[in-house]
Amino acid sequence: SLQWVGSASDAGKTRPTYYYHYHEKFSPEEKINKVVNWLKLPENVRPHFISLYFPEVDGAGHRFGPESPEAEKSVQLVDNAIGNLVEKVNQLGLKNVNFIFVSDHGMIKVDKENPLSIPEMLLNKEKFDIYNSQTLLRVVVKNPDEVKSAYRELKNSKTEDYQVFLTKKFPRKLHYGTKDDKYSRIGQILLVPNAPKIFLEKGKSTSSGKHGYNPRKTPEMKATFYAWGNVFKNQTEINEFQNVSVYPLVAEILGLKISEPIDGKFS
């Protein structure tokens, strides 16, 4: 794994055979060369699955906006790197090599000139803790007996630019409700701005591009999927699917049996 985010963590039982801790010092070209060197290893120690992450497009999209010249330049940079990778892998003469190119989210230019103010009542630190990721505002009500009254007050005072939810009644399809909160980190109330609106504290600045909106209502959030190699049909377009299904696809290609329940489906 070459800086695939989280793969070097010791949270799981097993780490990758070869891996690098995440940082952004390697250029795309350096990453390609490291991957090619892994593929040059003797067959008995050569990795069968390699993950590789490029942060350039995400960084430019956040800082300058997804439609900016800087974002376009970063896309060209990664596109050239992928082309270089494919060329070098082909030169190795390896058989049965497949490529899967994905993104973990989309991006949208936000309205940072007219941000939403955090409701005044939530600034009472004796009653509330708030966690603002700008495309989502999580509210922890310190007194559980006051959750319903706080929700009603927020609901009655909201504007058309955002929605207010009790976490336990958050839309199930978004996988961010009470049942999904294994470590009790979400809070009891969620304020969800409608794209491209964001919540922003007074006196703070923000970046031009964001993700984190509902992908069913904001198509800009949808991710990228390209795949090519001997197991994939050429010049074929497929319908959109949930990205959790990439995992069983990879397992199928590698001939691996998935022994635990997962969210994705191979079909």
Model-assigned labels for residue ranges:
Residues 1-65:
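His/Asp/Glu-rich, glycine-adjacent segments
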Residues 4-9, 56-59, 105-108, 144-146, ...:
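Solvent-exposed loop/turn segments at secondary-structure junctions
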Residues 4-5, 47, 230, 241, ...:
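…; additionally, a secondary subgroup of soluble metalloenzymes is captured
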Residues 39-43, 54, 86-93, 154-161, ...:
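Sec/Tat-exported extracytoplasmic proteins
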Residues 47-56, 71-78, 82-85, 97-106, ...:
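Beta-strand elements within well-structured catalytic alpha/beta cores of enzymes
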Residues 96-97, 103-142:
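Acidic/histidine-rich catalytic neighborhood
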